[in-house]
Amino acid sequence: MTEAKGLRRFFSKFICGDADDSTIEYEPYVYIPANSYSYAEVTKITTKFNRVHGKGGFGVVYRGVLNKQQVAVKMLNRASVYNIVQFTKEVHDFVKVRHKNLVSLIGYCDDGEHLALLYEFVANGDLNDQLSGKFGNVLSWERRLKIIIGVAQGLEYLHSELRILHRYVKPTNILLDENFEAKLADFGLSRSSPTNPDTEASNKIYVKPGRDPYLDDQYFNSNWLTQTSDIYSFGIVMLEMITNQPVVDNNRESPHISKWVDLQVAKGDTLEIVDPRLNNDFEPTSVRKAMDIACSCAARAHNRPSMSQVVIELNECLALEKARSIGRTGEITQTQ
């Protein structure tokens, strides 16, 4: 089947319209073959862009419905994409990528002035929303570990298997599905920037100068991102997850979270800076080890571990926490 015929057949099955969510029975997400969509088709998917799901550095995200499945449609600002021809080529490459910790890219729109990406819809928002208490719940320590392990596995796959950078690792780009499985978003935009000709393609990316608290000093000195830059960003996200503190707070002794944590750890206050909403309901050894991992990721570039190492060590943290939970269950059973 040609792409055009496949596209027509695909769109003949659309369940899109002006109906309210309550009138639509959504089906569990399954992989939809990727295609190129026209702007008119994207307009239909999003019901004329009437439901804004969120806003990010690349553009506005809208909710839509495609074949009884919810999808997220990111309308991109063309100014944010360095090379449209290269971008289109890479989108074709990325629609083939399937990893449980990466948001699935369904397709794209490149129609006149309109540029968009279509993704699977992820139900539980992003990590930033969850940590902020927006939904009224507090993530347990075990759940936080599982989430950050998912992020680490997604980055490990990007670095080791695809040999590309993510470049935008931050809580707003870590989405959580109905089971709170972490899925990295926006990785498909990582290669739409010029690469350094002196390195392997995609292993080093030039980024316009600017201040971003998730990027390391190496970037600020050179404006080039490397795998260690992603690892630094990951470490900062981990520190946020552990402490539930903002990345930058000018009222702190040291405004940036990495420096602030270093100061507190030097004082011996490791557990004192853990998110108080956890109410000390965690295995201390697991938290301390996780803090060490986060700090090593945020250390100087040549001292940072690989994501493969991080995955191994984080699973050890999870094993420690699970052992505590099992032990506590045993104690309750004996008491009864």
Please give the residue ranges for each predicted region.
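Conserved eukaryotic protein kinase-like
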Residues: 2-336
